[in-house]
């Protein structure tokens, strides 16, 4: 076996905020059981000389957490949320797949942990606007501020989790990763999300 590549998650660092954090700058401090298990798996891979990739938010076909969770939040609120400008590191699933293959085959990458995301972080307001425009628009009510949204979503832990995601920076910077792989990070959020929007609409309508 020439190389081990493990796709983990930036959630091994905990809840943030993280703004422009580079590899090695944030401690591994997982909060959830899932993140703790991934942090433990990372340790085994790194000890064996492997390569760990840490995406934050992965979107596109097959995503059953990020965008469906945001739609669930908007349904809970019957409105969108104003004042959400937190920056999120994002990557579409196709680009992530290319990055994994490139990392496995590249002769230039040694062991270690790297963030894998498009270099341009996405403001939460842009993410929300794209979901409302291309996937599902919430009820006709006016946008609500974060405090009101928190009160309305108080009975839904999942909705509160996604609301928290919109209000806390999770921006991880690792531009050298793409350069070292000689691999393009793709066109960015707007274009890739537009292509996956039909899949999201179908999934949310049918659950398949």
PLM region descriptions:
Residues 64-69, 82-105, 111-115:
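Substrate-positioning beta->alpha
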Residues 88-94, 122, 172, 187:
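Residue-level signal for the nucleotide or nucleotide-sugar donor/cofactor binding architecture
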Residues 99-161, 188, 194, 204-208:
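Mid/C-terminal beta-alpha module of Rossmann-like enzyme folds, strongest
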Residues 1-33:
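Conserved Rossmann-fold NAD(P)-dependent oxidoreductase catalytic core, especially the SDR/UDP-sugar
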Residues 48-52, 56-88:
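NAD(P)-dependent short-chain dehydrogenase/reductase
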């Amino acid at each position: 076996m020439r190389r081990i590549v493990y796709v983990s998650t930036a959630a091994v660092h905990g809840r943030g905020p993280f703004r422009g954090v580079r590899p090695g700058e944030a401690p591994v401090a997982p909060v959830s059981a899932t993140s703790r298990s991934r942090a433990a798996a990372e340790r085994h891979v790194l000890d064996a000389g492997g390569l760990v990739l840490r995406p934050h938010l992965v979107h596109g076909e097959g995503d059953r957490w990020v965008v469906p969770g945001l739609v669930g939040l908007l349904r809970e609120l019957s409105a969108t949320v104003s004042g959400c400008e937190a920056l999120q590191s994002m990557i579409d699933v196709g680009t992530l797949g290319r990055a994994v293959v490139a990392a496995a085959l590249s002769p230039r990458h040694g062991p270690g942990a790297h963030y894998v995301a498009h270099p341009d972080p996405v403001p939460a307001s842009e993410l929300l606007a794209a979901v409302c425009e291309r996937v599902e628009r919430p009820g006709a009510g006016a946008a609500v501020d974060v405090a009101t949204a928190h009160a309305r979503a108080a009975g839904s832990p999942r909705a509160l989790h996604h609301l928290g995601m919109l209000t806390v920076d999770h921006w991880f910077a690792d531009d050298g990763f793409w350069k070292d792989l000689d691999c393009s990070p793709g066109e960015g959020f707007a274009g890739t999300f537009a292509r996956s929007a039909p899949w999201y609409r179908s999934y949310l309508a049918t659950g398949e």
